[in-house]
Amino acid sequence: MTQPALQIASLHKTYDNGVTALKGVSLDVMPGDFFALLGPNGAGKSTLIGVVSSLVNASSGSVSVFGVDLIANRSDAMRMIGLVPQEINFNMFEKPIDILVNYAGFYGVPRAEALVRAEKQLKAAHLWDKAHMMSRTLSGGMKRRLMIARAMMTEPKLLILDEPTAGVDIEIRRGMWKTLQEVNAAGTTVILTTHYL
């Protein structure tokens, strides 16, 4: 039997203010899946993503990534995850190539290898021609694709995105879906939260 890419069992999260965001969530996402958590604001989507990406501590339950327990072996599990947060959070005064190379370096990727990966990811995101421009000059859709390219620099087996198309027009949304489909087709399991498909 194939090991799930992500396995969540009886996951609960109650915040300190008493708000319960997750009530016994269980799900399996299989390798190669393109999985969307669809729901309105307040449904617990971002909390679930937060728990899986180790930004939020669960109250109870378990999470494993390709069979590695997130609580017992957090660093091993996190090596397999790439995260794209909802907000754009890179330095607008850096060039896309530098953003990617520096990110990879933070995770221990040697500079020569990081440069190779950066070229690959910028080409995959259709941003290679923008590699040496200031990132503040990129369009909104390009910035979103740069966020995906950055997350892919560690070659994750599982890519998690929180509302990747929030606040963007239909044309940018189409471009984002195309980029994510290409990432998924290349073998990365994709999980995202959204209000709409």
What are these regions (language model features)?
Residues 61-69, 76-77:
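Conserved ABC transporter NBD signature motif
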